[in-house]
């Protein structure tokens, strides 16, 4: 059994694979000051709830954009599973060709997303990941990663309004009843949710214009469904795209 772990700034996504089948998955809050033993206890509880026997785990693939946790999860895999985890980065063989100025700066999650989308949909393809930041990644028909964009995440945008505007407050991130709101809550929801859909439409349109063709737009991340419901720019939502990408990378690099 393969364990895939995507460590983001806000959440950690964990998936257990039996072959190509995702048999269990979890999402927990990222606590960057936790130690390996603390995460071990958390994993043990999750495995109990999911009916997963840790003795069956014989491989682990990890993407991490939180440097303090890289060593902790490596230690966890050594101690708990007796495996040497595959820590994904731009040097990990994936079959993708990086046509950007500094490939080493690419987050491992973006690499996993790009490979999974390219394998599933071919290219060109645009990948959107809605996380702490929202990332856009573009892969060509020949498997070249040619770049993308990074925008402030939806949560960051909403929090900035709450923290920096004295008379505004936190609101639930849901679709407002209509675009033209009639109270402050609906005003903010319209600006954040529908405004973000407009941001997606604008960047996708510009990227496809540079590519010279339309192409699939694949979205993943916690708020992908919310934004996809508000725009036709997103072709499909793949909730487990990053975990699937980690599985694919692991299979490519198995000894």
From Swiss-Prot:
Binding site for substrate: 107-110, 184
Subcellular compartments: Cytoplasm
Gene Ontology CC: one annotated term: cytoplasm
Subunit-structure text: Homodimer.
Top-level taxon of the source organism: Bacteria
Entry note: cofactor: A monovalent cation. Ammonium or potassium.
Residue positions binding ATP: 6-13, 132
Named cofactor requirement(s): NH4(+); K(+)
GO BP term, pick one: coenzyme A biosynthetic process
InterPro entries found in the cross-reference section: ATPase_NBD, Type_III_PanK
Alphabetical list of HAMAP family matching this protein: Pantothen_kinase_3
UniProt keyword terms in alphabetical order: ATP-binding, Coenzyme A biosynthesis, Cytoplasm, Kinase, Nucleotide-binding, Potassium, Transferase
The protein's name: Type III pantothenate kinase
Record pathway: Cofactor biosynthesis; coenzyme A biosynthesis; CoA from (R)-pantothenate: step 1/5
Signal peptide: none
Catalytic residues identified in the record: 109 (proton acceptor)
Catalytic activity: (R)-pantothenate + ATP = (R)-4'-phosphopantothenate + ADP + H(+)
Phylogenetic classification of the source organism: Bacteria, Bacillati, Chloroflexota, Chloroflexia, Chloroflexales
Gene (name only): coaX
Top-rank EC class of the record's enzyme: transferase
Record-level Gene Ontology MF annotations: ATP binding; pantothenate kinase activity
Function: Catalyzes the phosphorylation of pantothenate (Pan), the first step in CoA biosynthesis.
Family: Belongs to the type III pantothenate kinase family.
EC number: 2.7.1.33
């Amino acid at each position: 059994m393969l364990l895939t772990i995507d460590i983001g700034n806000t959440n950690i996504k964990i998936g257990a694979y039996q072959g190509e089948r995702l048999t269990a998955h979890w999402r927990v809050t990222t606590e960057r000051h936790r130690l390996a033993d603390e995460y071990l206890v958390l994993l043990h509880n999750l495995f109990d709830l999911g009916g997963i026997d840790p003795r069956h785990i014989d491989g682990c693939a990890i993407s991490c954009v939180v440097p303090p946790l890289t060593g902790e999860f490596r230690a966890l895999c050594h101690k708990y599973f007796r495996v040497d985890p595959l820590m994904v980065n731009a040097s990990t063989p994936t079959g993708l060709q990086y046509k950007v100025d500094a490939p080493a700066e690419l987050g491992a999650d973006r690499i996993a997303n790009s490979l999974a989308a390219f394998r599933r949909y071919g290219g060109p393809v645009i990948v959107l990941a809605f996380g702490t930041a929202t990332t856009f990644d573009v892969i060509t028909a020949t498997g070249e990663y040619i770049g993308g964009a990074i925008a402030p995440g939806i949560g960051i945008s909403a929090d900035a309004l709450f923290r920096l505007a004295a008379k505004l407050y936190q609101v639930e991130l849901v679709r407002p009843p209509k675009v033209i709101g009639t109270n402050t809550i609906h005003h903010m929801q319209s600006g954040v949710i529908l405004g973000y859909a407009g941001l997606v439409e604008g960047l996708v349109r510009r990227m496809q214009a540079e590519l010279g063709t339309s192409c699939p737009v694949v979205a993943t991340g916690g708020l992908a469904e919310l934004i996809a419901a508000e725009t036709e720019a997103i072709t499909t939502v793949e909730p487990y795209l990053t975990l699937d990408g980690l599985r694919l990378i692991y299979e490519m690099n198995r000894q």
